[in-house]
Every structure is written in structure tokens, then in C-alpha cells.
Amino acid sequence: MFYPVVQILIGIILVIILILGFYHLKRKPPKKKCKTDTDCKDKGHHCVRGACTDKSCLEAVKQDIKDIKLDPTIRSCDYAPGFYRFNATTADLQSPFGKTRIDLGKVWTTWSKEDEYCQSLCLQHKGSIGWEFDEMSLRGEGNCYCYTNSHPALKNSNNTTVMGIARNVL
């Protein structure tokens, strides 16, 4: 008398297990957690907000830095360790971000990495989230600026300006 009921219950349980099995197979595996780009090197991806991604640098900037304002003429950037690097870009000096500009004066190095030297100077400045290097001559001399406002506003500039905005890697 209970035999058909038991068969139906076993059938229902098997159908539920089958449905759950298919659901589990269709789910995407969780994104790999990361702290730096080197954690994502196996696929050529970059680390953005703690997850490996293959997004373009500009897409990553918009996801990573909330409330960033980018001039529509800015079409690209590069991933750099700890920073997003923009060529021919400067801060909008009329914005709250631009008004936090700290002029570190002229810098010059003999190792032809003036922008990296400017970056290292700004990293030593408390609260700095961005840096800008404006090359004045081909001899490696230029002006170095740091920024402390956490809502960047960037616009196009001359070809000798390099800007870096800190990445929010977890």
C-alpha cells in the first residue's frame, strides 16, 4: 500500500537532485581574488577591486574610482603598479580635485624616469591619491604635482604631461 508512494517520493528526490546538479554546472566559477596584477598574470588580466579582470584600463578606472570625471576626449590609459597612468592628461584645476594641487616644484633625475620620480615623491606625501609630471625639457626636467582629493576630474592636456591616479586594489 505504501510502495507506490515511496517510489513517487524517490522519483521526486531524484528530479530535485538532477535539477540542482544542472543549476550548479551552469553557475560561473567565482572570480579569482587578487591584491596585485601579478596575482592575475596567468590570464593576462589585471587586478581591479580585488578581482582579476580583462577590462580595458578606462573601463577599470570607471569601475574602480567612484565619481571620477573624465574628459570625453581621453580615450586610453595604462595599468601601472598601484596607479592608472594617463598620457597627455592633466587635472581640471577648476574642480575640487584640481584645487588640491600641491606643487612640488621642478624635478630632475639622471635615470630618465622623471615621472616615476615624481610618483615616488607624491607617495611620500600624506593623503596623496594622484600625481602629475609636466616635462619642461628633453633633458628630463619638469614640474611635479600631487593631488589629495579623492574625486578625480581629468582633462586632456599637452603631449608632455603624464598623470597617475591611485588604484583601489584591495
Curated annotation (Swiss-Prot):
Intravirion-side positions: 1
Keywords: Early protein, Host cell membrane, Host membrane, Membrane, Transmembrane, Transmembrane helix, Virion
Induction of synthesis: Early structural protein.
Topological type in the membrane: Single-pass membrane protein
Topological region Virion surface: 23-170
Cellular location(s): Virion membrane; Host cell membrane
Bilayer-spanning residue ranges: 2-22
Main subcellular location: virion
GO cellular component terms, A-Z: host cell plasma membrane; membrane; virion membrane
Family that this chain belongs to: Belongs to the asfivirus envelope protein p22 family.
Name of the protein: Envelope protein 168
Organism (species): African swine fever virus (isolate Tick/South Africa/Pretoriuskop Pr4/1996)
